[in-house]
Amino acid sequence: MYLLVDVGNTHSVFSITEDGKTFRRWRLSTGVFQTEDELFSHLHPLLGDTMREIKGIGVASVVPTQNTVIERFSQKYFHISPIWVKAKDGCVKWNVKNPSEVGADRVANVVAFVKEYGKNGIIIDMGTATTVDLVVNGSYEGGAILPGLFMMVHSLFRGTAKLPLVEVKPADFVVGKDTEENIRLGVVNGSVYALEGIIGRMKEVYGDLPVVLTGGQSKIVKDMIKHEIFDEDLTIKGVYHFCFGD
């Protein structure tokens, strides 16, 4: 049994699998565990006796301050050194200026895509930030980063005197008739339009590539963005393939 961890800025996903095909997963707020013992106190009730079966731990983290917690947790409770996801040559080539700057979550997504769906495609991951990644002939060619949906609404709320904090959901109208509708239209629908523009330009240059959609906020716009594949476990699958796959 393997423990797979995706440490994000807002939430962290913990998943267990035997074969990299079926996954059980749990989502925790990243800020709730500041020590290895706090992390154990949250995970032990969820994993139960399964913890005794863990023989490997793989981690994709974009929060460096949590890496020490994960390392100590792995050593103290499993006597295992975790394997960390990072860009390196293997099943994927990294055709960017500084591969070490590519976030571990994006590395995991690209590895999972190449392993499971093919060597050509576009990956949209909607989390705290929204990322777009391009894979051509098994080579990671780069991508784009946008603010995430919740980041946008919180930014408007915190950065202004009067704008409210609104529910993040799609707008089914062309123009907003009150402040809340204006924000929803600008944030949610505006993000979709931006993604469509980025994807459209990539397809003009690289061909009609399939699009895979993933990420904790992707369900909000799932019916608005044209995509061929929806895979909410893409990042976790990538952690498995990178750390324990062939």
From Swiss-Prot:
GO terms for biological process: coenzyme A biosynthetic process. One of its GO terms (molecular function) is ATP binding. Its cofactor is NH4(+); K(+). Keywords: ATP-binding, Coenzyme A biosynthesis, Cytoplasm, Kinase, Metal-binding, Nucleotide-binding, Potassium, Transferase. Pfam families: Pan_kinase (PF03309). The keyword Membrane does not apply. GO terms for cellular component: cytoplasm. It is an enzyme of class 2 (transferase). Its EC number is 2.7.1.33. Pathway: Cofactor biosynthesis; coenzyme A biosynthesis; CoA from (R)-pantothenate: step 1/5. It is found in: Cytoplasm. K(+) binds at D125. ATP binds at D6, V7, G8, N9, T10, H11, S12, V13, T128. The active site is at D105. Substrate binds at G103, A104, D105, R106, T179. It catalyses: (R)-pantothenate + ATP = (R)-4'-phosphopantothenate + ADP + H(+). A monovalent cation. Ammonium or potassium. The keyword Kinase applies. Signal peptide: none annotated. Belongs to the type III pantothenate kinase family. Catalyzes the phosphorylation of pantothenate (Pan), the first step in CoA biosynthesis. Homodimer. This is Type III pantothenate kinase. It comes from Thermotoga sp. (strain RQ2).
